[in-house]
Structure formats: structure tokens, C-alpha cells
Amino acid sequence: MFLLLLLIPLIGIGFVTIEGNYGLSLINNIRIKSIALTTSIINLVVSLIMFILFDFSSKQFQFIEEHYQISYFDIYLGVDGLSIYFILLTTIIMPIAILCNWNSIQSKNVLSFVVIMLLLETLLLAVFLVLDVLLFYIFFESILPPLFLLIGLFGSSNKVRASFYLFLYTLLGSLFMLLSIVAMSSIMGTTDFDALSKSNFNYVTQLFLFYGIFIAFAVKTPVSFLNTWLLKAHVESPLSGSIILAGIVLKLSLYGIFRLILPLLPKASLNYTYIIYVIGVITIIYASFSTLRTIDIKELIAYSSVSHAAVYSIGAFSNTIQGIEGSIALGLAHGFVSSGLFICAGGILYDRSSTRLITYYRGMAQVMPIFSVLFFILSLGNSGTPLTLNFIGEFMSLYGVFERMPLLGVLASTSIVFSAAYTIFMYNRIVFGGSYSIYFVENIGDVTRREFIMLLVFVVLTVLFGIYPAPILDGLHYSVSSLIYSIN
């Protein structure tokens, strides 16, 4: 059944390619974008149907499909109570990522843009669907070429430099994971998730495998001092690229922790938790101080993403139900809120004023009241305010860390103070901050219907699951309990 999720975007690529052969007139471009948007919405509907049919009382993989491809190599697809939420996150964000650049892509580049977007959706979903370590690595790395092209073709002035930073940093970091996977395969004779989870690597072997995989995920998260590629990619990327990076790509390492590190290398992950916590706390403090000093809106949101990613990453290593469930909830919440904030910064403010400097804006509440309300709710989420999903995820993640190592838990909790400080500064300076300029009255209008729909989706999801998180937390319970049992 989950094969549909991979085939639908590929079928959409076929349709838009056929439509592109008729020329790139204005009407054809609208049709091409409409086909791509419809395709991604159909994929969202399919994922929702599968979510409804999913049995959350089972800890096993479901809807398993086997497809024989080449000699002695089978491709297994399946989903469990952890991956289903990442699949939903992907299918929710992708239609909005296509919609957010609806008017900004030049006519001659429309076909290339939608093909890259649909291909990215297929590859991202494949990461969450495959049940094989080697295939996980292949699809984990295969998203780099489309992202490279997305930033390199449609980014801003320094797009080529940013795309090369993205490609080289993540590719070199992932080579260590490849070495670990090859070692696993040579020792066990298989790369199947289920078979490897039943293996019992000795401690020294686990240690070397752990470091190889962790380095790859540390670059992808990214941790402090390895985040240069992310900042450049966010700042230079088109809006859709920023949304995909913050909303989905940064969650690949979180998912990889639950698939590769915790169940396959339990001794190493338990014994070296303190190192991960120290790195996480340093990342939180470093990213937070960097956020407090920047005046670039996209850069502020990017640094904020690094800080929140560090929180849900250390929560994942807490070895507690609360910490692991909280890390996934915070990962989902961050996907919604950061995507919404990037739309506010790069899709609304920048499109109208052509600047990302916070000091340029003031008094937006007077000329953009609807935008100000939606921006306010997303800012509350980013600062971890109660009644938002971010609060639940952050509180549970930090609770898990505190249960494991109280001192580092206290230091990690400074993220709450820092996130409130820089988010309040950003919102207050843009929305209030004195009288508005006459330029805003003449050139800036409130959100359009398209922009309102995009922001409303993220606002509703953030608040709805913040008030009623049971569909997420209850659904995760069996899978998380099973994961902790396998670790211990």
C-alpha cells in the first residue's frame, strides 16, 4: 500500500513533463504547477487514509511490501508507529512548499522546479518507508542532488556557494555512516532492520559503529560548529527550500537515531549519552546566543532551528518514554512552526520589501493585521508557550533529559528562556516597534488568500495538537515502549 506514496509523485512528474512538451506559456505553467500541487495533495490524502487504518496497538511494522529488484536483493517497505508521523509531516509540508513559490518562479523554470519538488517528495518518503539500512543510506543521500539543484537554480545571490556547502558538508559527514553500514553488513551478512535489531554486537564494535553513524547525524542535525552549511543554505535558498530543510530534512537525523542508533547499538548509546548531552547543551547555548545577536530574520529562524533540533535530539537519547515521545512531538512541532515562520519572513515580508533586516521593519500591526495575528501564534509556538505543540514536546524532552542527567537537564532548559527572548524581540520589532513608514502604506498589503491558507494550516496544527496531543502521544506509546525495551 505504501508503494502508492512513492509512485504518485513519480506519476506526477510524468504528467508535468508531458504538459511541458506543449510549451511554457502562462497557461501551461499554471497547469504544470496545478498538476504538481494536486499530486502532492493526493499523496497527503493517501497518507491520511493509511494513518486512519494504522493499528497503533501493534509495535510491529505494518503494510509491509516486498519488491524483488535485482539478484539476491529485496526491497522491503513498511511503517510503524514512529515512521507514520514523519510520513505525515512530509506529505503535509510538501503541498505548501510547492504553493509558497507559486508566483516567484520564472516561467522558463517552472517545469524544473516542480520536477525537483516531486522528486524530493518521493526520496524523502522513501527514507521513512524502507526497512533496510543500506537503502536508508542510499535514500538519505539521494536527497542531496535535488536540494543542490533547488538551491543552486532558484536561490538568491550566493546560491552556488550555499548549494556546494550543503552538498559537501552532508556528503562527507555521511561517509562515516556508510563505513558503519558496510561493517554491519560484513559482520551480520544482512542489512535488514529487523535482523540487525536482533544482533548482539560486542561493545567495542558498537562503539565504532556508533561514532560513524552519529557523526553523519550530527552534521545533518546540525550540532554546534557544524552548522555553517545550514545557515548558508537557509539564507540563500528559495522559500520552498527553506521549508523543506527546516520542516523535513532536519528530522531525518532524528528518525535515524530511532532506526539505526538506539535499537542497533544500545550499549554505546547508553554509555555515551553524556557526550551527546554535552554536545547538545553547547549547541543550544551557542545557537541561542548567535540568534540573539543577528538582525536577519531568516538567519534568526535558522539559528532557532539549530537550537530546537538540539533539544529534540538530546530528548531522543533520554531512554525514557516521556523524553522520546517529547522529542518526536517537538520534531513535528518544529516542522510546523519553523515552516510557518519562514513563510512569514521569506514569503510575505521579503516579497513585499526585498529585505530581511529586522531593523527595517516596524508597525506591521497597523498595515497587516491578519498577518500579525498569524505571526503572533507561530511566534508563541517558537518560544514554547503553553497550548502549543512546541510546549508539550519541549517540556517532555527536557523532562527526559532531567531524569537522566539533572545538571545537564537544567542547562538544556535555558533554551526556554533564550527562545522566548529572541522570538519576542523579533515579533515586537517587526509588528510593533513604533510608527510605520509611509513606504509600507503605499507598497505593502495584508496577506493574500494563498498566504493565509498556508499559514493557517501550520497555525491550526500547532494549536490543535497543543490543546489535544493525544493523537500523537497515544499513537507513539506502543512503539516507544517497545524501543525502550529493546534498548534495555
From Swiss-Prot:
EC number: 7.1.1.2
GO biological process entries: ATP synthesis coupled electron transport; electron transport coupled proton transport
Main location, first listed in the record: mitochondrion
Keywords: Electron transport, Membrane, Mitochondrion, NAD, Respiratory chain, Translocase, Transmembrane, Transmembrane helix, Transport, Ubiquinone
Positions of disulphide bridges: none
Role this protein plays: Core subunit of the mitochondrial membrane respiratory chain NADH dehydrogenase (Complex I) that is believed to belong to the minimal assembly required for catalysis. Complex I functions in the transfer of electrons from NADH to the respiratory chain. The immediate electron acceptor for the enzyme is believed to be ubiquinone.
Similarity field: Belongs to the complex I subunit 4 family.
Protein name: NADH-ubiquinone oxidoreductase chain 4
Organism this protein belongs to: Aspergillus amstelodami
Gene designation: ND4
